[in-house]
């Protein structure tokens, strides 16, 4: 069995990201931190509900086992 290292999200820190979560949940926010389990911290977050409604949720910590995908919304240089 191979050892998995920490996710390489350094290039996404302090950038606006889109996070797809299990249960068809979507969150947008600024990535402020993460750990080896893909637990992440977002600030200025907005949750997009299934019906399209957007709800400001501010700062949020998301457990890594809920994360399906993380995508930056800022242009990478």
From Swiss-Prot:
Residues 4-76 form the Sm domain. GO terms for biological process: mRNA 5'-splice site recognition; mRNA cis splicing, via spliceosome; mRNA splicing, via spliceosome. One of its GO terms (molecular function) is RNA binding. It is found in: Nucleus; Cytoplasm. InterPro entries: Lsm7/SmG-like, LSM_dom_sf, Sm, Sm_dom_euk/arc, Sm_G. PANTHER family: SMALL NUCLEAR RIBONUCLEOPROTEIN, SMALL NUCLEAR RIBONUCLEOPROTEIN G. Plays a role in pre-mRNA splicing as a core component of the spliceosomal U1, U2, U4 and U5 small nuclear ribonucleoproteins (snRNPs), the building blocks of the spliceosome. This is Small nuclear ribonucleoprotein G. It comes from Schizosaccharomyces pombe (strain 972 / ATCC 24843).
């Amino acid at each position: 069995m191979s050892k998995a290292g920490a996710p390489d999200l350094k290039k996404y820190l302090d950038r606006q990201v889109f996070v797809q979560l299990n249960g068809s949940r979507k969150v947008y926010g600024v990535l402020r931190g993460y750990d080896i389990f893909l637990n992440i911290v977002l600030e200025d977050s907005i949750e997009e509900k299934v019906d399209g409604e957007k709800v400001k949720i501010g700062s949020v910590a998301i457990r890594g086992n809920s994360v399906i995908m993380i995508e930056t919304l800022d242009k990478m240089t």
